[in-house]
Amino acid sequence: MSEKPTSIKLVVVGDGAVGKTCLLISYSIRKFPEDYIPTVFDNYVVSLTAGTRQIQLALWDTAGQEEYDQLRPLSYSSASIFLICFSVTSSVSYDNVITKWHPEVIHFAPKVPIILVGTKLDTRNDPAIVKRLTEQGMTVINTAKGEELKNRIKAVKYIECSAKTSENLKTVFDEAVKTVLMNKPQQRSKCALL
């Protein structure tokens, strides 16, 4: 008899347009979506194997826009892990991890592990983006600042990735599954022989 798959609920939060939906779509169907469509709520389920365990990874996408602040926390129930995302080319989204996303997550799910994700890694060295940021008196977020933020919010990991190029994309989800499995007791059969 085969074991029931382990269910993991992964919830992704962060500002609108930081790449949360692209992260999930690129991972789940291995194709980067070229069009931006703001999310209200979406879920995807990915079946995978971790060692000998079958995993049902439920990916919950959330809307980052302010008008969904009252609705979004409804998706936090029974979360196994959170990905708090910011764009490495947006200091506003980086700052909002501290002022909005981390406080919201720990308010509704204080014991659930968090992985901090720096998205849009492929744009960090884009000359046009760097020039635009410089003209606005801003800079890209480097890895050291990401690690500093990880420590500040006590996230278990900080990972930078690109949904567009797939750089470190699989790593984000592998680390999320690994984190949950390390903290989740092995389910045992409820059958006993006397």
Swiss-Prot record:
Any Pfam family the entry gives: Ras
Keywords: Cell membrane, Cytoplasm, Cytoskeleton, GTP-binding, Hydrolase, Lipoprotein, Magnesium, Membrane, Metal-binding, Methylation, Nucleotide-binding, Prenylation
SMART domains, A to Z: RAB, RAN, RAS, RHO
Top EC class, one word: hydrolase
GO-annotated cellular components: cell projection; cytoplasmic vesicle; cytoskeleton; plasma membrane
Motif Switch 2 in this chain: 61-79
Binding annotation for Mg(2+): 21, 39
Swiss-Prot/TrEMBL catalytic activity: GTP + H2O = GDP + phosphate + H(+)
Keyword Cytoplasm among record annotations: yes
Bilayer-crossing regions: none
GO biological process, one term: cortical cytoskeleton organization
S-geranylgeranyl cysteine lipid attachment residues: 191
Location of the protein in the cell: Cell membrane; Cytoplasm, Cytoskeleton; Cytoplasm
PTM annotation (Cysteine methyl ester): residues: 191
Ways its activity is controlled: Regulated by guanine nucleotide exchange factors (GEFs) which promote the exchange of bound GDP for free GTP, GTPase activating proteins (GAPs) which increase the GTP hydrolysis activity, and GDP dissociation inhibitors which inhibit the dissociation of the nucleotide from the GTPase.
Propeptide: 192-194
Main location: membrane
Protein family according to the UniProt entry: Belongs to the small GTPase superfamily. Rho family.
Known role: Small GTPase which cycles between active GTP-bound and inactive GDP-bound states.
UniProt domain comment: The switch 1 and switch 2 motifs undergo large conformational changes during GTP/GDP cycle and play important roles in the interaction with downstream effectors.
Subunit structure: Interacts (GTP-bound form) with PAK4 (via CRIB domain). Interacts (GTP-bound form) with PAK5 (via CRIB domain).
Protein name: Rho-related protein racC
UniProt source species: Entamoeba histolytica (strain ATCC 30459 / HM-1:IMSS / ABRM)
